[in-house]
From Swiss-Prot:
One MF term in the entry's GO annotations: structural constituent of ribosome
Gene name, Swiss-Prot/TrEMBL: rpsB
Keywords recorded for this protein, A-Z: Ribonucleoprotein, Ribosomal protein
An example Gene Ontology biological process: translation
Pfam family, one: Ribosomal_S2
PANTHER family: 30S RIBOSOMAL PROTEIN S2 PROKARYOTIC AND ORGANELLAR, SMALL RIBOSOMAL SUBUNIT PROTEIN US2M
Domain of life according to the entry: Bacteria
Name of the protein this chain belongs to: Small ribosomal subunit protein uS2
Lineage: Bacteria, Pseudomonadati, Pseudomonadota, Gammaproteobacteria, Pseudomonadales
Family: Belongs to the universal ribosomal protein uS2 family.
């Protein structure tokens, strides 16, 4: 079972929240106090919630379900892409396109266009075009790859979302909520936990903290896949219901 410990979180600065004047009262029960006008997150509450989320992800992966990693702000994008690739999970690291979940039919068509352009780039088609047309297609390919490259192999809707900054990725969370897709999210002291099924109260800005979240989640996916034993997609719905109770 994938687990993190208190020392890991302290070293990563998970306990440092935002300035006290920016706090969200809905996160009050996860705040230990304040130091130099910075809220300090109660890691004794974060620890079991983080590990519960890791267990959920591991069991999902064990059932061959897909977890979509989402982190599009500058401090998160590179780490999200690297760790998602390490565990073979889909990811969004550049910009969340509206309708990425709720209008997946259109997104699927864009992914097909991306794949077609990739084939053309490799089979010499671009070389046969005029310079202007080749440049236009190359730019189109780069744009599509930046937006959709992380989900081109997803194959369908994900079974869960893992989100680094719930404020920054609110559109993604809203879409997941509409479709009944469970959401795991890192929630800082300035954010609202609404719409998040598995809350991880913690610093969503520090690079080391983001590395801890993403590395731990990727490890959970890998561990789950290495222990495949009859999990099912229905498990996600069961866990969501249990979390709501």
């Amino acid at each position: 079972m994938s687990q993190v410990n208190m020392r890991d979180m302290l070293k990563a600065g998970v306990h440092f929240g935002h300035q006290t004047r920016y706090w969200n009262p809905k996160m009050g029960k996860y705040i230990f106090g304040a130091r130099n006008k910075i809220h300090i997150i109660n890691l004794e509450k974060t620890l079991p919630m983080f590990n519960e989320a890791l267990t959920f992800v591991e069991r999902l992966a064990q059932g061959k379900n897909k977890i979509l990693f989402v982190g599009t702000k500058r401090s998160a994008g590179k780490i999200v892409a690297e760790e998602a690739a390490r565990c073979g999970s889909p990811y969004v690291d550049h910009r969340w396109l509206g309708g990425m979940l709720t209008n997946f039919k259109t997104i699927r068509a864009s992914i097909k266009r991306l794949r077609d352009l990739e084939v053309q780039a490799e089979d010499g088609t671009f070389a046969k075009l005029t310079k202007k047309e080749a440049l236009m297609r190359t730019r189109d390919l780069e744009k599509l790859d930046r937006s959709l490259g992380g989900i081109k192999d997803m194959g369908g809707l994900p079974d869960a979302l893992f989100v680094i900054d719930v404020d920054h990725e609110r559109i993604a969370i809203t879409e997941a909520n509409k479709l009944g897709i469970p959401v795991i999210g890192v929630v800082d002291t300035n954010s609202s936990p609404e719409g998040v099924d598995y809350i991880i109260p913690g610093n969503d800005d520090a690079i080391r903290a983001i590395q801890l979240y993403m590395g731990s989640m990727a490890d959970a996916v890998i561990r789950g896949r290495n222990n495949v034993a009859g999990g099912t997609v229905e498990f996600a719905a069961e866990e969501t219901q249990a979390a709501a109770e």
